[in-house]
Amino acid sequence: MTQLKQARKGIVTPEMEAVAKTEGLQPEFILKGIADGNIVIPVNKLRKNLKLCGIGKGLSTKVNANIGTSTDFGSVASEVEKLKMAEMVGADTIMDLSTGPKINTIRKAILENTCLPLGTVPVYQAAVEAKDRYGAMVKMTADDLFGAIESQAREGVDFVTVHCGVTRQVIDTFKGQGRLTDIVSRGGTFTAGWMVFHGAENPLYEHFDRLLDICREYDVTLSLGDGLRPGCIADATDRAQVAELLVLGELVKRAREAEVQVMVEGPGHVPLNQIEANVRLQKSICEDAPFYVLGPLVTDIAPGYDHITGAIGGAIAAAAGADFLCYVTPAEHLSLPDVTDVRNGVIASRIAAHAADIVKGVNGAAERDRQMAIARKKLDWETQLKLSLDPEHARVTRDRFKTRGKACSMCGDFCAMELAEKHLGVSVSRC
């Protein structure tokens, strides 16, 4: 039985208990959230020794790290190195977005080397193999696509991004809309290109029940991809984006009826003043399904710093109710990310997630900041480093300049904490 089916039967599974313990909540809270469809636990029934992760309403905001090869660059060793870095700095899940050679070997190596939930975009495998087999991606068959989905489910993939909402009607809306950046989702482009070439409906939509059968058998969580997400802020919240979202709302209902866990992906590039509205719209249309956002990026003019533009948008989105942040790295729009980019991307998104969790009232979030404030007042550097999101970087920065006393090298003899104690009678308890 799937986690959703067991939740509806009132069965608290070991996975629900583990997530409850991590979140500091009662197992019954997790059970109800899964039964209602506003919490998911991505866990393929074939995966063992997984570090379980709950995503959704009332839980801490989670962070995903994308890794994977491109057609020109990448190797098993480099992707495993990125994987280990993402794990080390606190990613909650991993997605393999490989499109290069040895795509199956890469995915299997990632599965063998991680205890985190793994997600994929199966159309990438189907497209790569169709190009090799038939000479063109668009010549893949529906069976090729569903074959890729099922083979990955058998391997143990925990969640899959599928662009089911890119329908013929939605494509007509997109064509009538007019956009600056057209379609920027690779999976969305592959799907739309296939539909135009064959003059046919999206097989993931037309045969959605077949997809549900696979996911139900292996308890793979569906992540309904936003193939028409805006690729620039000028395209944000347009008719094409909303038309696809309406379809995804229908598919959320069908997935729940089939007792398959489901979450929904979202934009993309969105200006600050539209982010909250986007979250509210998704939550309404998709009946409070967990919301998984890429960023969103709040400006288009910061290549090299898009981990920052994404963290700004991610903090606002998560504070408004988004549940799951897909990290953005400094390499976004420029190149394949390297291991340093992965580190910076995860940390930036974790900062955004934590900032939002304070607003959400997530269990323990504000208390960590309170403990940091106490440690700072005491000039207790070890506790400050321990509480920081990136202790290694904080320690290196702290140690760049050696000081005579306990104050940092910025203030020295003019430390505000020490002066307050000396002249205002505000006690600073020394560590």
UniProtKB/Swiss-Prot annotation:
Binding site for [4Fe-4S] cluster: 408, 411, 415
Top-level EC class as recorded in UniProt: lyase
GO biological process: thiamine biosynthetic process; thiamine diphosphate biosynthetic process
The record's free-text note on cofactor binding: Binds 1 [4Fe-4S] cluster per subunit. The cluster is coordinated with 3 cysteines and an exchangeable S-adenosyl-L-methionine.
Positions bound to Zn(2+): 269, 333
Keyword line: 4Fe-4S, Iron, Iron-sulfur, Lyase, Metal-binding, S-adenosyl-L-methionine, Thiamine biosynthesis, Zinc
Catalytic activity as recorded in UniProt: 5-amino-1-(5-phospho-beta-D-ribosyl)imidazole + S-adenosyl-L-methionine = 4-amino-2-methyl-5-(phosphooxymethyl)pyrimidine + CO + 5'-deoxyadenosine + formate + L-methionine + 3 H(+)
The enzyme's E.C. designation: 4.1.99.17
Binding-site list for substrate: 66, 95, 124, 163, 185-187, 226-229, 265, 292
Cofactor requirements of the protein: [4Fe-4S] cluster
Molecular function via GO: 4 iron, 4 sulfur cluster binding; carbon-carbon lyase activity; zinc ion binding
Involved pathway(s): Cofactor biosynthesis; thiamine diphosphate biosynthesis
Alphabetical list of InterPro entries matching this protein: ThiC, ThiC/Bza_core_dom, ThiC/BzaA/B
Family affiliation: Belongs to the ThiC family.
Role of this protein: Catalyzes the synthesis of the hydroxymethylpyrimidine phosphate (HMP-P) moiety of thiamine from aminoimidazole ribotide (AIR) in a radical S-adenosyl-L-methionine (SAM)-dependent reaction.
Protein known as: Phosphomethylpyrimidine synthase
